[in-house]
């Protein structure tokens, strides 16, 4: 039948070409002659006839190619020399020693802080009448108060302030180390009206007494102090005051609400807002216990001041201290020289050795000390031969002032080192005088001269100075200063 396959014809055998084109999943791969298919033409498998997958064998690593690991003989010592081990031990011991010394120093500093705080908390408040009549150092008290009034009168006003004109801007004052509030009356009589006064001190009892003094002034209608420039005016409106127990040298003051409200700029270029004046009278020397404290103090000052604000204060005179220390050391050198020259002959003429039980003990070298019946300065340890304190921190001495200070530890403030350090915080020196120089320059001022009479520094009729030579010597232990924030 043309065009079709004969039904009786046997199936054709496949040639080689057809075998090569057979798909890879043919029955030859699974060991069966033919692969059954379903109606759709898909392959079907008999699971029982499938062979399991062959397990893959890993190739073995060649043996003997890598060198065997060299084992350390038990008990063998590391390849470190005895000198290295000794140096390591010495470094460890040195670290331990430094850690002990640091801990001891921290403990001593805390003890000193506690001593100072306890001392000022314990000083009784005797009242103005006692200070004017019964105090043995009433002349010194009056003189120092007049000096502080001079500094406040001269440097608390803004540069563009015009005396005698009311209604001008008021100033904001931060008093670090305010103590019992002894300067509240002086600020009430400041040439430029004070709007806000913030007093801080680490001694809690002193802060309580400052609050009491402020309440007393408030009850008197703001009267306090003895007047200053324009002292003939009536009593001004009493300024607002806040008091806080705070160590302004050992910790930041920016956590105090009123400080943040006024404005605190911690950056070097701040100064848009802040206080007009920061005052530190007879207290800043405590900051020079360590460099860390001195810098913290200056950070607080610079952060609290606005640009153009003033830092005023009074501190011990480092020039006087250096001179006294140098003179003491020169005397000690001369004394040792004389002892050495006379020592051999005096011992040979004794005629024999020391008696049984006696010891020839070397003479203990005296530390630097000076003063009079009113005040005394004593260094507990060795001082620099040339009187120059290097480094400028941590030079402790004990200070005594009759009726006021009982052997309290204080610290030298080397003036040039302080001035240079202040420049790092944009504080530029404007004025620096000893108390004697201040008296000589301001005693005849048309305002400050009469103020000295009202404050009983000199006699109103005769002009005689009502301060003894001993009190003047004690007063000249101090200097006043003023810095501007630039």
Curated annotation (Swiss-Prot):
Keywords: Methyltransferase, mRNA capping, mRNA processing, Nucleus, RNA-binding, S-adenosyl-L-methionine, Transferase. Residues 1-92, 333-365 are annotated as: Disordered. It is found in: Nucleus. Transmembrane segments: none annotated. It holds the Pfam family mRNA_G-N7_MeTrfase. The gene is ABD1. S-adenosyl-L-methionine binds at residues 148, 177, 201, 247, 281-283, 286. Responsible for methylating the 5'-cap structure of mRNAs. This is mRNA cap guanine-N(7) methyltransferase.
């Amino acid at each position: 039948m043309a065009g079709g396959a004969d039904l009786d014809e046997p199936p054709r055998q496949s040639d080689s070409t057809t075998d090569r084109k057979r798909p890879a999943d043919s029955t030859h791969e699974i060991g069966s002659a033919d692969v059954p298919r379903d109606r759709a033409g898909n392959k079907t498998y008999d699971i029982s006839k499938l062979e399991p997958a062959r397990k893959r064998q890993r190739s073995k690593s060649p043996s003997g190619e890598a060198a065997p690991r060299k084992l350390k003989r038990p008990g063998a010592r590391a390849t470190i020399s005895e000198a290295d081990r000794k140096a390591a031990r010495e470094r460890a011991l040195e670290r331990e020693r430094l850690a002990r010394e640091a801990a001891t120093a921290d403990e001593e500093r805390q003890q000193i802080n506690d001593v100072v705080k306890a001392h000022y908390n314990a000083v009784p408040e005797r009242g103005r009448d006692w200070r004017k009549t019964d105090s043995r150092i009433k002349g010194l008290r009056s003189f120092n108060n007049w000096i502080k009034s001079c500094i406040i009168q001269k440097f608390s006003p803004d540069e563009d302030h015009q005396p005698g004109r009311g209604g001008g801007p008021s100033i904001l004052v931060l008093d670090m180390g305010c103590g019992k509030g002894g300067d509240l009356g002086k600020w009430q009589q400041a040439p430029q009206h004070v709007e806000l006064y913030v007093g801080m001190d680490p001694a809690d009892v002193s802060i309580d007494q400052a609050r009491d003094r402020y309440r007393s002034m408030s009850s008197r209608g703001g009267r306090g102090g003895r007047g200053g420039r324009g002292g003939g005016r009536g009593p001004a409106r009493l300024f607002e005051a806040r008091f806080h127990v705070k160590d302004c040298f050992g910790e930041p003051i920016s956590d105090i609400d009123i400080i943040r409200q006024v404005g605190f700029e911690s950056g070097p270029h701040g100064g848009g807002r802040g206080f007009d004046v920061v005052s530190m009278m007879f207290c800043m020397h405590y900051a020079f216990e360590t460099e860390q404290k001195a810098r913290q103090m200056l950070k607080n000052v610079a952060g609290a001041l606005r640009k153009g604000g003033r830092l005023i204060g009074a501190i011990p005179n480092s020039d006087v201290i250096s001179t006294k220390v140098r003179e003491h050391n020169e005397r000690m050198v001369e004394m040792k020289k004389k002892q050495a020259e006379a020592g051999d002959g005096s011992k040979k003429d004794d005629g024999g050795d020391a008696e049984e039980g006696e010891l020839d003990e070397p003479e203990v070298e005296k530390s630097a000390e000076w003063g009079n019946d009113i005040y005394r300065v004593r260094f507990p340890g060795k001082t620099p031969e040339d009187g120059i304190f290097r480094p400028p921190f941590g030079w402790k001495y004990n200070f005594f002032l009759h009726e006021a200070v009982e052997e309290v530890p204080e610290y030298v403030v080397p003036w040039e080192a302080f001035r240079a350090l202040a420049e790092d915080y944009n504080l530029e020196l404007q004025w620096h005088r000893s108390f004697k120089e201040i008296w000589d320059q301001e005693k005849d001022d048309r305002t400050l001269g009469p103020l000295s009479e009202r404050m009983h520094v000199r006699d109103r009729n005769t002009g005689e100075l009502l301060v003894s030579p001993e009190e003047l010597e004690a007063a000249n232990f101090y200097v006043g200063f003023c810095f501007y924030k630039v």
